[in-house]
């Protein structure tokens, strides 16, 4: 089963494809959809084009995204919500469904602690997948953690 984890953002969108075979999880690909600072419409287009490439490159069985988080700046929340809406629509058009996890659920699934620091999440992601090199940036680590969280919550049919 191939799982796509997505960490939505307005500047960079982290993504990771992992494969789950029984209890074994393997990282297939991870990276960023880089979003150039331009008009909102163009930024959303970049995000959707990046998703198209990922879906065309892999036979994805499941998609998981991080649920929207609270931000202090209302403009940031609004922009992220617009990105999230476009992201959701694109996934539904291509794949048909997706699962959502809050940051606390992801941290708890990966580290055992809902209030874990990002560095703890990064450490556990590397440990779980047997990766020795550093994974950067944290958007990518978060996307891997999202995919792993879904892998713990799904049964292979």
Curated annotation (Swiss-Prot):
Superkingdom of the organism of origin: Bacteria
SUPFAM superfamilies referenced in this protein's UniProt entry, alphabetically: Ribonuclease H-like
Amino-acid positions noted as binding Mg(2+) 2 in the UniProt annotation, renumbered to this chain: 66
A cellular-component GO term for this protein: cytoplasm
Catalytic activity, reaction form: Endonucleolytic cleavage at a junction such as a reciprocal single-stranded crossover between two homologous DNA duplexes (Holliday junction)
Protein task: The RuvA-RuvB-RuvC complex processes Holliday junction (HJ) DNA during genetic recombination and DNA repair. Endonuclease that resolves HJ intermediates. Cleaves cruciform DNA by making single-stranded nicks across the HJ at symmetrical positions within the homologous arms, yielding a 5'-phosphate and a 3'-hydroxyl group; requires a central core of homology in the junction. The consensus cleavage sequence is 5'-(A/T)TT(C/G)-3'. Cleavage occurs on the 3'-side of the TT dinucleotide at the point of strand exchange.
Entry similarity comment: Belongs to the RuvC family.
Assembly and oligomerization: Homodimer which binds Holliday junction (HJ) DNA. The HJ becomes 2-fold symmetrical on binding to RuvC with unstacked arms; it has a different conformation from HJ DNA in complex with RuvA. In the full resolvosome a probable DNA-RuvA(4)-RuvB(12)-RuvC(2) complex forms which resolves the HJ.
Protein name in the entry: Crossover junction endodeoxyribonuclease RuvC
Organism, scientific name: Campylobacter fetus subsp. fetus (strain 82-40)
Lineage: Bacteria, Pseudomonadati, Campylobacterota, Epsilonproteobacteria, Campylobacterales
